[in-house]
Amino acid sequence: MGTQTPLSENYKQYPVDLPCDENEALALLRMQTARGLGIQSAHLLLALCGTAQALWNPQNEDQQQARHLAQTKFPDLFSTSTDQRALREWARVQSLGLWTWSLTLGPYPHNLKQCPDAPLILFGQGPLNALGLNHPHRHRKLISVVGTRSMTPYGQDFLIDFMADLATTGVIVVSGLAQGVDICAQLQAHKNGLPTISCLAHGMHQIYPAHHKKHLPLLLEQGGLITEYWYGERAQPAQFVRRNRIIAGLSEVTLVVESPRKGGSMITAHLAKSYERTLCAVPGRTGDLNSAGCLDVLARPDYAHLVRHAADLFRHMGWDDFVPQTRKQVVPELNLAQQDVLRALRQRGRATADHLSVDTHRPVSEVMGILLGLEIAEVLYRVEGGWFVPKTARN
C-alpha cells in the first residue's frame, strides 16, 4: 500500500491529558489482539461483563460466565503471548505520547459509542481532547465528508464554498486522508478555521498516501488523527473498509460530495444509514460517473437528502442554532479580452488554448496570457492535458 512515512518526530507535540484507566486499556488491547476474537464477539463479552478487565477478575456470576465463555471459545485471549503483545503496545503508546479512548472506561466519542461495532480502543494525536467529543450534549456538531479520489473541479468548487459557509459555525469536519475529496475537505476546513478529525486505516507510524505528510502540521493544529490500528500496522485494503465505520459513526451526518456507484464512499454512506444517521449527497449531472453514486442514494425514497450548499444540510439536520455564514460572492472585474475568452470557454464547457484561439480569433500566445489571468482570478481551472474548465456558478 505504499512507502511508510515515520511520524515519530510529531508525537510529543501534545501532552497526553485524557484520562484512561491503564488496567482497562491493557484488557482491551488483549481483546483487540487475541486470535479468533472479532469485534462482534468482543462487544458481546463486554455487554456481559461491563468492563474488559472483569474477564480477568470476575466479581459476579455474569462476569464468571463471560470468562468461562471466553476461555472456551477464545483461549488465546488469556495466553502469555497475547498479554506480552498488549503490554508492549501500551508501553509504546505511552512513550510516543499518544492519547487513548477506551470504549468501556473513560472518555470515548459519544456518537461512535452508540455503534454496535465501535472500536474497543482508539489511539490519537493532536488536541482533539478540546473538542468535547465524549459529551452527548456538547455544543459542536460533526459532519463526515466523503467522496472519490478522482475529484473533479465541480467537487472542488463545492467544497470551497461549503467550507467557507461553515466558517462561523464551529462545526467539526471528519474525513479520511485520501487524494481527492478527503484531503480537499480537510484543507478547506482548516482554511476556514474549522477543526478536523482525520481517520487513518493504519498505525500512527505513517501517513497514507505518503505525500500528504506535508499537511500534517495543519491537521494537528486544531484537530488531529485517530486510528484503531497499532503502531506498525500497515495500510491494507480491508482496513480502509473497516476504517469507514469510524468516519460514519463519529458524526451526526455524512455528506457524499462526488462518488461513483461503487467504492469506499458508498460503503461509508450505507454504514451511516445502518447507524441511523442522516445521509446527504451533492447532486451532479446524470451522465457523470463521479455523480452516479450520489444520484443513486438521492433517488432512493427517504434515504438521502439533496445538498446544494451548507444551508440545505443545516435545514435537514434541524440545526437552527447554527447559522451558516452568508457570503457575497466576489465577482472579479475582468477586462474585455478576459470576458471574451471566458465567454467562449463557458460555451464549450472545457477547452484548450488552441480551441479558444479559434473561437476568439486571437493568437494562442495572447490567449495563454489571458487564461493565466483568469486562473489567478479563480474563475477557471487548469486540468490535465492542457484543458481549461470554467468555475461552476453556485446554485
Label every PLM stretch briefly.
Residues 2-24, 103-395:
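Glycine-biased, small-residue-rich flexible motifs in mid-sequence functional cores and linkers
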Residues 2-107, 377-385, 390-394:
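Short, small/acidic-rich helices and loops at N termini and domain boundaries
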